[in-house]
Each structure stands twice: as C-alpha cells, then as structure tokens.
C-alpha cells in the first residue's frame, strides 16, 4: 500500500510539474508607426473573378523587417512588413506589396485591411486601416460600416519549435474603444478567461503542445456580448 501511495504521489508531482499556467501579458517595445497610413486607391473585379486591389502606403515600408524582429520571441515573417486582409473575420491573408489580387466569395463580404509589422502585430492608429464591403445588393442588406467591430488577427496557423513558447494575441477594433469603465474584449484561451480593457498587443505563454482554442468577444460594460456581425469569433491553432 505504501508503494502504491509513493508512486501515486510521484505521478501527481510529475503531472503538476508539466502543467504550466496559461498567462496573458502586454507585449511592449514595438515601433509605434503613428504616422503610417493605408488608403485604398481602387478595387476592381478582373476577368478571373478575383478582385484587384491597389493601396497607397505612406510612412511605412512594406517588405522591411520591423525593429525587434527575431529577438522579441514572436514568430516573424521573413518577407517583412505587410498588409493583413481579413474577410468576414476569417483567417487573414498577408500581402507584401501595395497592389495584389484576391479571390473573394460571391455575396456580401466585410473586408478589413491594416498595416502589420513583420511579426504580425497590427499598426493601431486611425489611418492604418481600411474597412470596406462587397455585395449587399438585392435582398442582401449591406453591412453598417459605422457599427462597432472586433476583428481577430493572431495567433494563427501552426507554430513549431521556439515559436510555440510565446504567441502573439492581437485583434483590431473599428468604431469602438475598450476601457476599464466601457467596452472590453473577453479572450478565452483553452478555457481560461481574460478580460482585456486596453487595446494593445499581448502575448500568451504557458501553452502545451497540441491544439489551442482562442475565442474573442466584444462585450459591453455589463459583460454582455455586443450584437454586431462576426462577434464572437473563435479560432484554433496548433503547437508542434
């Protein structure tokens, strides 16, 4: 009996040692790019049923490596700074030039573009994004672009090796602010809930190898879900 108790104690100690606590902390130190600007010049449906987008980018260099890349512990794009494109709050596509084509499903689509650092942290200033929509004709009512929106950006996809240690949690707010007294973002990571009241990037630590589920919700001061399109949003990523 003593031997069984001994091995059980060892198992509990070993299990606890291998279960790390999930934490969420502010990520600080990135260049701010407060003068960076992204504006849409044109978008046209081409003969291949894809959209051709043309942007004007000011005070920001696409393709450059952002200061801090490679030393801040975050997954980084070797292709440098880019534009994130999010359609209907789905996973973003990254674009490294100011002109590109993208296939988009027919029907009503809400599309957000914003400038991104090479390690996928969004540039958060009033001129660094463009919000638009396609479709919304006939009986399909268009989106109200003045509504409050929460867009999910990171984490995304598959993380390997050292990139699994620290995951960037980043989202984009449009037509709303978050604060201790006002709206907030509720982030749930593998069942652990965090209430966010400051729009800054964060990083997640303490995750185990395997599948990670991240859910983001825009909530009001009473903790109630705000009834706007694509809220809440949930995403799964994999750590290998």
Language model regions located:
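C-terminal motif of bacterial Sec signal peptides marking the signal peptidase cleavage site
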Residues: 12-15
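Short, compositionally biased P/S/T/A/G/V-rich stretches that sit at domain boundaries
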Residues: 19-48, 136-161
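Short amphipathic, basic-aromatic surface patches that mediate peripheral association
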Residues: 39-40, 57-74, 156, 171-177
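Short coil/turn motif common to extracellular beta-sandwich-like domains
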Residues: 46-53, 65-71, 161-170
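Short, well-structured beta-strand segments within conserved domains
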Residues: 51, 55, 105-117, 171, ...
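Short beta-strand elements bearing conserved aromatic residues within extracellular beta-rich modules
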Residues: 83-85, 183-187
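Short beta-strand segments within Ig-like beta-sandwich modules, predominantly Fibronectin type-III
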Residues: 89-97, 191-199
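Short acidic/polar inter-strand loop motif in beta-rich domains
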Residues: 92, 116-125, 194, 219-228
């Amino acid at each position: 009996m003593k031997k069984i108790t001994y091995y059980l104690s060892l198992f509990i100690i070993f299990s606890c040692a291998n279960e790390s606590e999930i934490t969420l902390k502010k990520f600080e130190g990135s260049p701010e790019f407060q003068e960076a600007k992204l504006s849409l010049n044109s978008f046209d449906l081409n003969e291949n049923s894809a959209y051709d987008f043309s942007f004007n980018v000011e005070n920001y260099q696409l393709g450059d490596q952002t200061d801090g890349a490679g030393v801040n512990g975050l997954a980084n794009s070797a292709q440098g700074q880019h534009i994130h494109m999010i359609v209907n709050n789905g996973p973003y596509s990254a674009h490294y030039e100011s002109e590109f084509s993208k296939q988009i499903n027919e029907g009503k689509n809400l599309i957000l573009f914003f400038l991104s650092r090479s390690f996928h942290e969004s540039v958060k200033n009033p001129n660094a994004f463009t919000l638009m929509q396609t479709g919304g004709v006939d009986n399909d009512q268009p989106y109200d672009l003045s509504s409050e929106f929460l867009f999910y950006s990171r984490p995304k996809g598959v993380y390997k090796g050292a990139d699994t240690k620290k995951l960037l949690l980043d989202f984009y707010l449009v037509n709303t602010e978050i604060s201790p007294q006002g709206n907030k973002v509720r982030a749930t990571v593998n069942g652990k809930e965090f209430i966010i009241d400051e729009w800054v990037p964060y990083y997640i630590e303490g995750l185990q190898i395997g599948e990670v589920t991240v859910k983001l919700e825009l909530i009001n001061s009473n903790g109630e879900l705000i009834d706007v399109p694509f809220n809440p949003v949930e995403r799964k990523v994999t750590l290998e």
